[in-house]
Amino acid sequence: MITAKAVKELRERTGAGMMDCKKALTETNGDMEKAVEVLREKGLAAAAKKAGRVAAEGIVKTYVSEDMKKGSIVEINCETDFVALNEEFVGFAGRVAELVANSNVNTVEELLAEKLDGDKTVQEVLTELIAKIGENMSVRRFERFSVESGLVQSYIHGGGRIGVMAELACEASSPVLAEVAKDVCMQIAAANPLFLSEADVDQESLEKEKEIYRAQALNEGKPEHIVDKMVMGRIKKYCKEVCLLDQAWVKDGDKSIAKLLEEKSKEVGSPITITKFVRFERGEGIEKKEENFAEEVAKMGGK
């Protein structure tokens, strides 16, 4: 006979519904371990069905080691903002971020094959979470950071909507370095720079911008001899918008990020440079499916 206590235990272990737990125990003649396997198998089937659904919500999570010498940033997606706030989902994202920082994986495929909880791989834990919560989820991307002289810093905005990580190099050890690194991360979150400096802007993009500005100037009827000067002026303005070092600091519009680093370098007695940064915005680039409410109602009604 299947007891209520056994059903409760199985439910706590698997997160499956009460009726599903009772059926699994009945099917396995009360064998708890076999019942867990049965539910996992059913969970895997359910997860496979959900894999076709668009997961454009989710969370960006960061991890920085205590000594601030290494860190990582990951984006993990789900289908709804409600699940993005789920404690288990958020906890999973945090554990994956820490795993990335302490591993040598280079691709999402390699990451999914890494052990996360005991003998379970990231993929296995993710699949179980999909089955338990009932939404499609995916590990989308990650970036790992490591520095010898300097530190790694992160910033999360909007409860995981935007995440930033930056790597700053400096020979000096000072609390000021962590402060400026946090300011840099907040700048990246707010201003969304595409490049570190003008030297990093790819020439193809720069030439395209020049062509656009030249055409605009000529269409405005500007004389040919001043068009080049106008184009260069507009390119400078473009670089101030997309290059981190050229951007006006969000906390003080009269000061560029390059100027901020220069001042802080003098304060700590050693040059501070930004060697790497990344900004993840949840769901960016994912095409969301437009839902047709009438169709959904018709489907539910079996029409």
UniProtKB/Swiss-Prot annotation:
Annotated Gene3D superfamilies: 1.10.286.20, DNA helicase RuvA subunit, C-terminal domain, Elongation factor Ts, dimerisation domain
Subcellular location: Cytoplasm
Region described as Involved in Mg(2+) ion dislocation from EF-Tu: 80-83
Cellular component terms per the entry's GO annotation: cytoplasm
GO molecular function per UniProt: translation elongation factor activity
Keywords for this protein: Cytoplasm, Elongation factor, Protein biosynthesis
InterPro entries the record matches: EF-Ts_dimer_sf, Transl_elong_EFTs/EF1B, Transl_elong_EFTs/EF1B_dimer, Transl_elong_Ts_CS, UBA-like_sf
Family in the record: Belongs to the EF-Ts family.
Record HAMAP family: EF_Ts (MF_00050)
Function: Associates with the EF-Tu.GDP complex and induces the exchange of GDP to GTP. It remains bound to the aminoacyl-tRNA.EF-Tu.GTP complex up to the GTP hydrolysis stage on the ribosome.
Name of the protein described by the UniProt record: Elongation factor Ts
Species: Clostridium perfringens (strain 13 / Type A)
Gene giving rise to this polypeptide: tsf
